[in-house]
Structure formats: structure tokens, C-alpha cells
UniProtKB/Swiss-Prot annotation:
UniProt cross-references to InterPro entries, sorted A to Z: Rbsml_bL25/Gln-tRNA_synth_N, Ribosomal_bL25/Gln-tRNA_synth, Ribosomal_bL25_b-dom, Ribosomal_bL25_C, Ribosomal_bL25_long, Ribosomal_L25_dom, Ribosomal_uL5_bac-type
Organism whose genome encodes this protein: Helicobacter pylori (strain ATCC 700392 / 26695) (Campylobacter pylori)
Protein name: Large ribosomal subunit protein bL25
Alphabetized GO MF terms: 5S rRNA binding; structural constituent of ribosome
Top-level taxon of origin: Bacteria
Length: 178
């Protein structure tokens, strides 16, 4: 479980001092809870996010424990370093909006026909309760030929999960190389 510290002061000077000490500024918020301003050690946070198996993960700030999902993050445009993260605290049985990653498997047939695999969307917006949240959508791209694509409506349907993106949006496809 990730452990962080609660920020007593939310001033700019305090944030700069924490960043200088290797901390990542974070906000935890959600339906029915008071916003918590916190900070996590940057490197352990990134390592934990890369190793986690589920979208929802536990964090501890002070003496409070939250089940959270990364809602939004900000990176430094020059160094590409993570500088801020918003964590949405989830409550079982309460529907929320999430962004679920799309993973693909297989090698498209169209690559042999001088095509290029084009990822149009990396994440799909869904609305559901946290206990029904899929960890990812897996797309098999092996049957795709040149000028073919997989649309949102072609994704597998999960029970109690509503996809918010329009069903005619392309998720992944193979285009002809020029």
C-alpha cells in the first residue's frame, strides 16, 4: 500500500519545498468525502503504479486509508516529470466515471500488406460502480487488414458497465502506409 503525508499548508512555497524533497503533490477527493491534500514520494509512487494489477488501489494518507483510482495527472512539459496527481476515492456501490485502458494483442494481417497499426484511443470512458470496473479492454487486432478498424461498439460488453464514448469512434485500426 502506498503511504503519503497530509499537507498541512497548501501554499505554493510548501508545494515547492515538498517537490524539492522528492514528493509528488496529490489531491484525494470523491463523493461523500472531504478533499484531502497530500504528497507521496515520487519514485515509489511511479514504481507502484507500474506494478499494480488493478485500476483501483489503496493509499494511506496520515491515519486515513482510501481506495482510489488515478483520475488525472500533470507532467512538466520540458522534463516530462510527473508533478501532480488527482486521485478519485471510490465507494462501493456508488457509480463514478472512469477511464479504462485499451490493450491490444496479436499482429494485424494488414501489416504484411504495407499497413501501419494506428491507435486512435488509449482509454475508454465508462460509468459504473467500482466493483464492476474492468481493469482493461483487450482487443484482438490479428484479423485487421488495411483500412479496417475496431470501433467502440465492437468492444466486449461488461455487465453493469456503461461505455460513455460514442459507439462509432474508432479505437484501433490499420491504415495504408504512404
Amino acid at each position: 500500500m502506498l503511504e503519503g503525508v497530509i499537507r498541512e499548508s497548501i501554499t505554493k512555497a510548501n508545494a515547492k519545498a515538498l517537490k524539492k524533497d522528492g514528493y509528488l503533490i496529490a489531491n484525494v477527493y470523491g463523493k461523500g468525502i472531504e478533499n484531502v491534500n497530500g504528497a507521496f514520494k515520487l519514485n515509489p509512487f511511479i514504481k507502484y503504479l507500474k506494478e499494480k494489477k488493478h485500476l483501483i488501489f489503496p493509499v494511506k494518507l496520515g491515519d486515513k486509508t482510501f481506495e482510489v483510482v488515478v483520475q488525472e495527472y500533470q507532467k512538466n512539459p520540458v522534463t516530462n516529470e510527473l508533478i501532480h496527481v488527482d486521485l478519485l476515492a471510490v465507494t462501493k456501490g456508488v457509480k463514478s466515471k472512469f477511464k479504462v485502458p485499451i490493450k491490444h494483442q496479436g499482429t494485424p494481417v494488414g501489416l504484411k500488406n504495407k499497413g501501419i497499426l494506428m491507435l486512435s484511443k488509449k482509454r475508454i470512458s465508462v460509468e459504473c460502480a467500482p466493483e464492476h470496473l474492468p481493469d482493461h479492454y483487450l482487443v484482438d487486432v490479428a484479423p485487421l487488414d488495411v483500412n479496417e478498424s475496431i470501433l467502440v461498439r465492437d468492444l466486449e460488453k461488461h455487465e453493469n458497465v456503461k461505455i460513455l464514448d460514442h459507439d462509432s469512434i474508432a479505437v484501433i485500426g490499420v491504415i495504408k502506409a504512404k
